[in-house]
Design a protein with these regions (language model features):
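Nuclease-adjacent, charged terminal/linker segments that flank catalytic cores
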Residues: 1-49
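Hydrophobic, Leu/Ile/Phe/Ala-enriched alpha-helical segments that form helix-helix packing faces
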Residues: 4, 16-20, 65-73, 126-134, ...
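Acidic-and-aromatic substrate-binding clefts and catalytic sites of carbohydrate-active enzymes
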Residues: 5-7, 85-89, 115-117, 149-152
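Solvent-exposed, charged helical/coil patches
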Residues: 31-32, 38-79, 83
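Active-site metal-binding core of divalent-cation-utilizing nuclease and nuclease-like domains
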Residues: 68-104, 114-116
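Conserved beta3 VAIK motif of the Hanks protein kinase fold
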Residues: 108
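Catalytic cores of nucleic-acid endonucleases
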Residues: 112-163
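Charged, structured surface patches that assemble and position nucleic-acid processing machinery
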Residues: 138, 163-176
Length: 176
């Protein structure tokens, strides 16, 4: 509502009611969550790939990350970051990537229930990427943003970031 400045709750409900043929609705916590159904995707010329309910919480946290990072325009969802180390091609697939006004790479990882071992493997790759990026971009570092849901996970992620010497910002968003 606040992103699109559509006024009050009654107006928002009226708009959502008008869009009903193109939307699916579910409850998340105590709020309704609306998302495009197959017809809604077709309206925009997309392939009709609908977010499954199992991935809905992940998608919502990714949307919260977008809002928290001031709505970057060039947001790319699950797009590869490719690099070469020791003549071997490697890649990382963050949940989101974008560049800021200084053209610095930002990668966003949404961590709701991922095993810490998987996060550790990701941070090892980000360590490699950081070293290569630093050399290519005059000492500048890529920024890795982790959005998680508990203080415990925040602490563990910060420990791993220190261990692998990666510039990581960890945010706790407990409402999702």
């Amino acid at each position: 509502m606040s992103v699109h400045d559509i006024g009050g709750i009654r107006n928002a409900n009226r708009i959502m009611r008008d869009l009903k043929p193109y939307l699916s609705k579910t409850m998340q916590g105590k709020e309704y969550v609306y998302y495009l159904n197959k017809e809604g995707h077709a309206l925009f010329g997309e392939d009709g790939k609908v977010v499954s309910r199992g991935k809905l919480a992940h998608a919502l946290l990714r949307n919260e990350a977008w809002l928290h990072l001031f709505c970057p325009d060039d947001l790319q969802i699950e797009t590869d970051i490719r690099y070469i180390k020791n003549k071997e091609k490697k890649k990382i697939v963050p949940d989101v990537k974008f560049r800021d006004e200084e053209n610095i790479l930002h990668a966003v990882e949404v961590d709701r229930s991922q095993k810490m071992k998987v996060n550790e493997e990701k941070l090892k790759k980000y360590e490699e990427l950081t070293q290569i990026y630093k050399q290519k971009h005059n000492g500048k570092l890529p920024v890795i943003h982790f959005f998680t849901v508990t203080k415990y996970r925040e602490k563990k992620l910060e420990e791993l970031a220190r261990m692998y010497d990666v510039f990581v910002k960890v945010y706790v968003i407990a409402s999702i």
